[in-house]
Amino acid sequence: MARSVRVLVDMDGVLADFEAGLLRGFRRRFPEEPHVPLEQRRGFLAREQYRALRPDLADKVASVYEAPGFFLDLEPIPGALDAVREMNDLPDTQVFICTSPLLKYHHCVGEKYRWVEQHLGPQFVERIILTRDKTVVLGDLLIDDKDTVRGQEETPSWEHILFTCCHNRHLVLPPTRRRLLSWSDNWREILDSKRGAAQRE
């Protein structure tokens, strides 16, 4: 009997368009302040790039994503919802949404659950894994826009597939790392390669 391939899919920047929502919210709330266009975003933490632009902007940009309604109102990444549904329907495949809440979690946790229910349905709500440390979660693949995922486990069970986002598209990955350019890229090929490896175990 074939072993199932378990795919962990990050939420912000992979399923939900965090970066576009943040820029839109920042410009709406602070129209007179300088902002970082998406094509100039560098580094996973927007707060740090805004801090480098001007120190007081760090708290201002954080206030946007810490506000009620921010996570709930994020638009889906193009193709994400269809891809995850299709992936979940594949034989011998388990899909979980693996997402990290903010430290100021008061609004984001509930809104992440509501976002998933609204866009993917209640069956995916049961597949949410909420954790600050993704390295301790067992899986075969982690699709995530964060370029480096660290935690308690130095060698996590999953292979990290870097999902291309505005803040990481400039990074050159070593030959051993794989990247998914978008949901129209060939994610099925990545799953098939991992499935073949699982069957040889």
UniProtKB/Swiss-Prot annotation:
Pfam families in the cross-refs: NT5C (PF06941)
Necessary cofactors: Mg(2+)
Binding, substrate: F18, F44, Y65, T99, K134
Signal sequence extent: none
Top class in the EC scheme: hydrolase
Localisation per UniProt entry: Cytoplasm
EC assignment: 3.1.3.-
SUPFAM superfamilies: HAD-like
Gene Ontology CC annotation, any one: extracellular exosome
TM region(s), chain numbering: none
GO BP terms in the entry: allantoin metabolic process; amide catabolic process; dCMP catabolic process; dephosphorylation; dGMP catabolic process; dTMP catabolic process; dUMP catabolic process; IMP catabolic process
Residues involved in Mg(2+) binding: D10, D12, D145
Chain positions with Phosphoserine modification: S182
InterPro entries documented for this protein: 5'(3')-deoxyribonucleotidase, HAD-like_sf, HAD_sf
Catalytic residues of the enzyme: D10, D12
GO molecular function: 5'-nucleotidase activity; identical protein binding; IMP 5'-nucleotidase activity; metal ion binding; nucleotidase activity; pyrimidine nucleotide binding
Keywords: Cytoplasm, Hydrolase, Magnesium, Metal-binding, Nucleotide metabolism, Nucleotide-binding, Phosphoprotein
Keyword Phosphoprotein attributed: yes
Tissues and organs where the protein is expressed, per its UniProt entry: Detected in skeletal muscle, heart and pancreas.
Assembly: Homodimer.
Family per record: Belongs to the 5'(3')-deoxyribonucleotidase family.
Biological role stated in the UniProt entry: Dephosphorylates the 5' and 2'(3')-phosphates of deoxyribonucleotides, with a preference for dUMP and dTMP, intermediate activity towards dGMP, and low activity towards dCMP and dAMP.
Protein name as annotated: 5'(3')-deoxyribonucleotidase, cytosolic type
Upper lineage: Eukaryota, Metazoa, Chordata, Craniata, Vertebrata
Gene designation per UniProt: NT5C
